[in-house]
A protein has these predicted regions:
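Functionally constrained cores in energy, signaling, and assembly domains
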Residues: 58-60, 138, 216
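C-terminal regulatory domains involved in ligand/effector binding and gene-expression control
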Residues: 1-117
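Residue-level detector of solvent-exposed, low-hydrophobicity positions
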Residues: 28, 43, 51-54, 151, ...
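Generic alpha-helical propensity signal that fires on short helical segments
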Residues: 36-38, 102, 162-163, 168, ...
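C-terminal catalytic subdomain
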Residues: 192-216
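Accessory "access/gating" subregions that flank catalytic or transport cores
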Residues: 71, 75, 79-186, 190-200
Length: 216
């Protein structure tokens, strides 16, 4: 895994060192201490518990997220969605080879152009191109939203952006969809894993697909 060593010095004397591992999914492990466990702010770990609470209190998932996270989550998710859209639009404008020795060609722009030319620009093909655009920006070291990880960053943005453009959903509905998606991603992270390093690519992309499905 990606590793960070931090050394402490006083003058020229080394006082100590800590080693940190990035094990994927936003989680870290401290050498000799095991996995760092973040404090859970949500009161329920399983969705069965969450659903029971929602039914007993006649609440929707977005209302529950607002209750736990506070109103500040709305502004934050506006930033998140703006970044998702920016990344898609940026990725669609670029062509050429991605960085690295494999010489992989970008595909998002050519996919969009091909579908426009042959008149078959249906929604699932647009979403296909949007997902490529985000993933290729990630492969180029550009800014993406980890949803839930860099490796799966193309799924949720492409679905939300594609559906909003196609059906003209108001922005408020997209923000609520992000709340739902985030809750489901958090449930997976706390009960299983969203880390490709820990559980393979299916942990990342499978979770992203679940988040997108829940958001819809």
């Amino acid at each position: 895994p990606n590793t960070l060593d931090i050394y402490a010095y006083l003058d020229d004397t080394e006082l100590g060192m800590h080693r940190f591992y990035s094990i994927g999914g936003g989680s870290i492990e401290i050498d000799g201490e095991g996995k760092y466990v973040e404090e859970m702010i949500y009161p329920f770990k399983k969705f069965t518990e969450t659903r029971k609470y929602l039914e007993e209190n006649n609440m929707t998932i977005p209302e529950y997220v607002l209750q736990v996270e506070g109103e500040g989550i709305v502004d934050y998710l506006h930033e998140v969605y703006n970044r998702m859209k920016t990344t898609i639009k940026s990725g669609l404008t670029k062509s050429g080879k991605l960085p690295g020795s494999l010489g992989v060609e970008r595909k998002a722009q050519s996919i969009m152009n091909k579908f426009f030319i042959d008149g078959s620009m249906i929604l699932n093909k647009k979403i296909f191109a949007y997902a490529y655009a985000v993933s290729e920006e990630n492969a180029s070291g550009e800014i993406v939203v980890t949803a839930p990880t860099c490796g799966a960053c193309g799924v949720l943005p492409s679905v939300l952006y594609g559906l909003q453009k196609e059906y003209q959903f108001p922005l408020e509905k997209i923000i609520e969809a992000l709340m739902v998606a985030g809750l489901f991603g958090n449930i997976v992270k706390n009960n299983a894993s969203i880390s490709g390093a820990e559980a393979g690519c299916q942990a990342e992309v499978g979770t992203a697909c679940s988040m997108a499905a829940a958001a819809c």
